[in-house]
Structure formats: C-alpha cells, structure tokens
Amino acid sequence: MRKLKILFSMALVLATMVLCMIPSFAATSNKDKVYTALVKNGLSSAAACGVMANIEKESNFNPSAGSTSGAYGLCQWTGGRRSNLFSFCSSNGYSSNSVEGQVAFLMHELRGAYSGVLNSLKSVSNTADGAYNAGYRFCYDFERPSNKGSRSSQRGSVARSSYWPTYKTRDEEIKKAEAEAKKKAEEEAKKQQVIDLVKVFDHYGIAVEFVNATL
C-alpha cells in the first residue's frame, strides 16, 4: 500500500505538450497520389511506373487537363469514355476532376474493356525492364497515340529511367507509412483517454490525490 498522487494541472500540461508534438504532413503530390492508388489496386511498382510515364505525357498529372479535341483528364479520355468518366465519378461519390476519381475510373476500365492491358501490366517483372515494358504496353494498347510504336518506346524509356529509380521501393515505404499511421492512431486514442480521464477528475473535483491506492 502506498500513496499515489495525481496532479490535475500537471496531467493537463503534459497532455497539451504531447498533442502539440503531433507532426503535420505536407500535401501529397499528384504523382504520389497516382502511384499510391495504382499500387493499392494491385499493380507492382514497375507497372505503376509504366502507367505514370504515360500520364506524364498525356496530362502532366493534371486531372483537369483538356485539349482542343475534347480530351480530358489524366489519361486524356475522349468521346464516350470521357462521358463514362463523368458518370462513373458521379455514381461513386468522386469529383470528376480529382486524381482519386480518375484513377478509380482507370482501374474500372482496366478491369473491364481493357482487361488485356491489365493482364499485361500484372505480368511484367518488378524491375527496371519491367517498368519499360509496362510503359510500352500501356501506351501501345491503352492510350494508342499516333505513331504509337515510337511513342510507346519513348514512354517505356521514361518509365525505366525517370520513374523506376524514384518509385522502385515506394510500395514498401507505403506499407511502412501505413503501419506507422496505425501506431500513431492507437497512441492518439490512448492520449485521448488520458485527457478524458483528467476531465472527469476535474469535473468531480478529484484533482489532488488518491490516498492508500493499491498498486
């Protein structure tokens, strides 16, 4: 048996200090948003790099990008596919000019009419050469620009030389960040419990001490 003192003022100050130490995070770039969404939808880092190389050339990662031909968005959808993009986003609670909505629609297309492209993306090795192959196949079979042979080769090269060095280990980093975020959320829940308990003590005037508490 021993005396356990609980000081309300000290607990409140401590809780405030802990909350002030919570870090703030900068806004995520559109490139990172696209990469994260693609990986969460089952693509490897190499496959995601291939898609991103194409998005760079199509829209420079601007989901509001348009053209005189009526093309729109990250992948410059036209005609009926552009209309389908708007309908999909409206039906699924996305803004049609959001990265999240457009990547969701992209995956919707890849799982549907363009399932062959998705199979190609999933078959590439998770290597620099795999990034090249993903960039080439996505351009050749999905984007289908004029001079698609030479452009597919160019985009494959961009995927291999520009995106793969940056993103080759990013999926591991995402998993690590998610684990850390979960841990932080659990810690915050515990901090909130302390704050709530202190408020209860204060409400009932239990701020000085508990005497003869059993440990």
Report residues per predicted region:
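Sec-dependent N-terminal signal peptides of Gram-positive bacterial secreted proteins and lipoproteins
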Residues: 4-24
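Export/targeting segments at the very N-terminus of extracytoplasmic proteins
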Residues: 22-53, 57-60
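Peptidoglycan-targeting cell-wall enzymes and recognition modules
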Residues: 28-33, 59-130
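Extracytoplasmic/secreted envelope proteins and their assembly/folding machinery
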Residues: 31-35, 48-52, 74, 100-103, ...
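Acidic helix/loop microenvironments that form the catalytic cleft of cell-wall polysaccharide enzymes
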Residues: 55-59, 121-148
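A recurrent domain-boundary module in secreted/ectodomain proteins
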Residues: 153-178
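Intrinsically disordered, low-complexity, charge-biased segments
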Residues: 172-193
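Short, low-complexity, charged amphipathic interaction modules
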Residues: 193-215
